[in-house]
Amino acid sequence: MSLNEPSIKQRTSSKVEKKEGYPPMYRVVLHNDDYTTMEFVVQILITVFGKSLEKASIIMLNIHKQGKGICGSYTREVAETKVNTVHHLAREQGFPLKSTMEKE
């Protein structure tokens, strides 16, 4: 090891410090219910989460079959905004669609 090369301990602690600098991420989850149409869920996934029609359809089927599905991972503020947007749009259309966020 040369005098200018950092020790393993220095390199490791440097990597840990960088990782700790990232904000925590949150998964936004949509939950299945007996009233919200599959078409509306696909529309939400496209408009709110920027999914393609194909990807939105796959996520919607997961929600339908498994009871819930992950729409994406975001920082806390972005996840909160997306959850609130889903609830607002669902209520406007008379659907009880539920969206939550889970810390990763």
UniProtKB/Swiss-Prot annotation:
- Pfam (any one): ClpS
Q: Which InterPro entries would you find in this protein's record? A: ClpS, ClpS_core, Ribosomal_bL12_C/ClpS-like
Q: Indicate the transmembrane segments per the record.
A: none
Its GO biological process annotations read: protein catabolic process; proteolysis
Instruction: Enumerate the NCBIfam families for this protein.
Output: PRK00033.1-5
Per the entry, what this protein does is:
Involved in the modulation of the specificity of the ClpAP-mediated ATP-dependent protein degradation.
The similarity comment for this entry is: Belongs to the ClpS family.
Query: Which HAMAP family does the UniProt record give?
Result: ClpS
**What does the record note on quaternary structure?**
Binds to the N-terminal domain of the chaperone ClpA.
What is the designated name of this protein?
ATP-dependent Clp protease adapter protein ClpS
List the source organism: Desulforapulum autotrophicum (strain ATCC 43914 / DSM 3382 / VKM B-1955 / HRM2) (Desulfobacterium autotrophicum)
